[in-house]
Amino acid sequence: YEIRLSLVGSEMCIRDSTFTLSNGLRIIHAPNLSKVAYCGFAVDAGTRDEYEQEQGMAHFVEHLIFKGTEKRHAWHILNRMENVGGDLNAYTNKEETVIYSAFLAEHFPRAVELLADIVFHSTFPQHEIDKEVEVIIDEIQSYEDSPSELIFDDFEELIFPNHPLGRNILGKPELLRQFTSRNALEFTARFYKTTNMVFFVQGNIDFKKVIRTVEKAVSDISLSETNRQRIAPFTYIPQTLTINKDTHQAHVMIGSRGYHAYDEKRTGLYLLNNILGGPGMNSRLNLALRERRGLVYNVEANLTSYTDTGVFCIYFGTDTEDVDHCIRLVHKELKKLRDNKLTGAQLTAAKKQIIGQIGVASDNFENNALDMGKAFLHYGKFEGPGEVFKRIEALTAEQLLEIANEMFAEEYLSTLVYS
């Protein structure tokens, strides 16, 4: 196995260790001194991997995976970690599904055995499906009642038309009501394979114990490959669309396709995104739209990178009569970044801010564990904050100007308005 070291202060410490079992399952472990540990499976399967007739299946499986295995009923799964103060959780997005647990480190073997059981031996009982489908439909209806959330999905549909990346993760009620145990088993048979997932662990647990415990839990699972070919995104054509919604406020998205997860320019766009509409109250868009003019309550810029494409978008909500004014102000700020190279002081301040934000965010073991699992799944490694900081520090004003002119060109942007 591989162990990576990093220098912290004047002491050398183990940062993360990796190992691949004989059945192809990759393991990554990052130690810490916390009494709480996290572990789980990150599966390389999400919404974009569904067939047309099984839209919503990845998320559906994520819900039903807790509802019964060959040796456990739903009640036993629910209580297995809860009885020792731990919990089970999961999430689905466009490209992966993650099933994980949080617990006191002493209960690591219990968590691993349970996770392996539900990931590899779920039976998806039909009577549980019939109940859970209604729960998911309630989730869909709740989501549709929140235009500030729904518009993000509709925007991806706008820039990825007729493509799996443009689909809503939750699926469609009329399809969900047709799903059966067999459908769920067919989906997991395609993607829930050892070579198509990783197992991640963060906690005060000896790495040799990690390997032994995981190896024992998946000893009955053989090496298997996934024959999967993802459909590449179609040619991007900027679109402008207005949808009439019965809401008190207008909601607006402006953006385009962004860089994919392996593109070196992604770090530069990440910094520009933060300058424009990051979480800081001093972001350019927040100053221009909220602080100076009081036109919006919330304005934010977001960046999502997939394995072969990405999404850059700006969101704000405002009064209907202020929509055009706000859109002009957004384009004005984008033009400033296209036309004016950042000064040395501006670049230094932007780097310092985002490095501080990353540092604060990294002080969360659960987020670190999930980020580590996702990174190891897609990159085969996990970059600690120090490596990310180096890439940020290496950025130049010239690089950012080039990226701004490529990504923020007005003719390249799509606009979606709920009014």
Where are the language model's segments positioned?
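Active-site SXXK
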Residues: 56-69
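Charge-rich, well-structured scaffold segments of protease-associated domains
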Residues: 20, 76-226, 232, 242, ...
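Phosphate-proximal small/polar/acidic motifs at interfaces that engage nucleotide phosphates
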Residues: 286
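Active-site alpha-helix of zinc metalloproteases
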Residues: 6, 55, 199
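Single conserved hydrophobic/aromatic residue that forms the stacking wall/gate
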Residues: 1-14
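His/Glu-based metal-binding/catalytic segments typifying zinc-dependent metallopeptidases
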Residues: 28-33, 40-42, 225-282
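Short pre-active-site segment immediately N-terminal to the catalytic Zn-binding motif
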Residues: 43-54
